[in-house]
């Protein structure tokens, strides 16, 4: 089991590092620019990808496997990871599953269309402290589920 972080604009990297360290997991921090990572942990691996669209997503989708965990706010990337047998967790603690990913993709597309039509403005709610707590719980639950073989 390894953890893959879609690092660009990820507000829970530090929390993910701490949980992964406690479980002695390898963490791949993938982005198109350097982000801070713990220098004293050899299990944390920084991956810098080109600045082309979806380069980080493509790298993660190519390298992730069954039993791994992806941390991302990108719903299409979460869907790609699920197809490979990995777990996917949003940065607000929402666990994406085979049962929920279709609805999440549909809502994403609907909101994009409504924004383009001017029917709604803005994006998702700001990241809140409760999101951090939900994320920590979701990551721990995902790790335990993989360890139990689910």
Swiss-Prot record:
Disulfide bonds: none annotated. InterPro entries: UPF0178. It comes from the Bacteria. Coiled coil: none annotated. Belongs to the UPF0178 family. This is UPF0178 protein Rru_A0086. It comes from Rhodospirillum rubrum (strain ATCC 11170 / ATH 1.1.1 / DSM 467 / LMG 4362 / NCIMB 8255 / S1). The lineage of its organism: Bacteria, Pseudomonadati, Pseudomonadota, Alphaproteobacteria, Rhodospirillales.
